[in-house]
Amino acid sequence: MTATDTTASPTPSPVIEGQCHCGDVHWRFTAPVQLATACNCTLCRRYGALWIYDFEGPGVSPGTGISIVGNMEVYGPGRSIDFLFCVRCHCLAAWRAREAPPGAPLWMAVNVRLAAPDAVAHLQIQHFDGLDTFRDLPLDGRCVRDYWF
């Protein structure tokens, strides 16, 4: 009779990857995710961005986080976050918090419109009122696939 190992090995986090139109900027998102945010602030509305969030670099849980590489320019119209664009094709790739608590990684979001549609089609949309109330709005059952034209 052999002993059975009952310790579960950690399930790897799903990986979602995206890139800008010209391919110069690439991001990798490694964390469980169920929602993508559609924000109605003046910038997100104009670009049609849909966001998923985690920490830049290694996340809080092992095997999670966001990595982004490429030649990007920063646009920071407000006080708390910077938007990251490809310098060549100007796709909006991500935003990054300007500050983090001491010793903590920076909070970041990547634009799922730069991912393969099949990788993100199932994500539910969380509407965020970034224009007036700065609050999440009730879920309405729509998913990212409902936003592809």
Regions found by a protein language model. Give the residues of each.
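A short Gly-Trp-Pro
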Residues: T2-Q19, D24-F149
